[in-house]
Design a protein with these regions (language model features):
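Outer-membrane beta-barrel proteins
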Residues: 1-271
């Protein structure tokens, strides 16, 4: 839902860019969800009920002929910021953005298998897994402190991300500690290029240089993924394969094979 439409801002010099904007439009949106969570017999379930409460802000305006946009989303129960993004739409030259948590590059296709709602791993606690094993597997640049460039060429969308140092949501005037730089990209298109309606395909690759702290010598880790989804009538079928080759000694490479089927029964129900 959208509330408080057209909240006027006289200038966005500090919020959107280092140059002033004449006017912008801001909107507020929110989401809520009631959950019931039951743990297995090795864990304790006290009160199983929870509620998701998020609120977000978006704004856009014209700056020197370009469209400048900003978004920010709060964490659940308003416990700080979960993501923010400032972008400049340059028309045929593409879109350049600074991302702090919304998702860029390879991370935008970390899990493209069909679902009825959230991804199949949503809600898992990750016990017994590494940080990469549960949820979206790939994405070297991460989603915080990332420069993102998006453009479409001959029907193929390029989404690239690059990060200098650690993936940290720095406040204005701050910098992060030691951390490896990273870059990655995703290429996506549909079946129109090969004459197959309903087909969506994509692939991506990235590298992470590891830690740059004194006395630490790590080899680059590589991330890669590829997916294909096919929609026929109300049904969508999909498969995705992802792989991480860790450069750090003593770590194991990780692979994921995922498939999904989603079926739209009607406009109000999907399985």
């Amino acid at each position: 839902m959208n509330n408080f439409k057209k909240v006027g801002l006289s200038a966005l010099a500090g919020s959107l860019a280092a140059i002033s904007a004449n006017a912008a439009e801001m909107s507020v949106n929110g989401a809520t969800m009631l959950t019931y969570t039951s743990e297995d017999n090795t864990e304790t379930t006290g009160n199983p009920y929870g509620m998701k409460t998020n609120i977000g802000f978006t704004a856009s305006g014209e700056v020197n002929g370009y469209t400048v946009s900003y978004m920010q989303t709060s964490k659940d129960q308003f416990a700080g910021m979960t993501s923010a993004r400032m972008s400049i739409d340059m028309g045929d030259m593409g879109t350049l953005a600074f991302d702090q948590g919304s998702g860029s590059g390879l991370g935008t296709i970390d899990d493209k298998t069909p679902t009825a709602a959230e991804e199949i791993w949503d809600g898992l606690d990750g016990a017994g897994f590494t940080a990469d094993s549960v949820g979206g597997l790939v994405g070297t640049a991460g989603a915080s402190g990332v420069w993102n460039y998006v453009n479409t060429f001959e029907g193929v969308t390029f989404n690239g991300a690059i990060r200098k140092g650690s993936a940290t949501k720095n406040a204005d005037g701050a910098s992060s500690g030691a951390g490896g730089s990273a870059w990655d990209f995703a290429l996506t298109t549909d079946g129109s290029m090969i004459g197959v309606d309903g087909l969506a395909i994509g692939a991506g690759y990235g590298e992470d240089s590891g830690s740059t702290a004194a006395g630490v010598n790590e080899v680059d880790s590589t991330h890669m993924t590829a997916f294909a989804n096919y929609s026929f009538g109300p049904a969508t079928f999909g498969y995705q394969k992802s792989e991480i080759n860790h450069g750090k000694q003593g770590t194991q490479s990780e692979e994921t094979d995922a498939w999904g089927i989603a079926f739209n029964i009607n406009e109000n129900l999907s399985v």
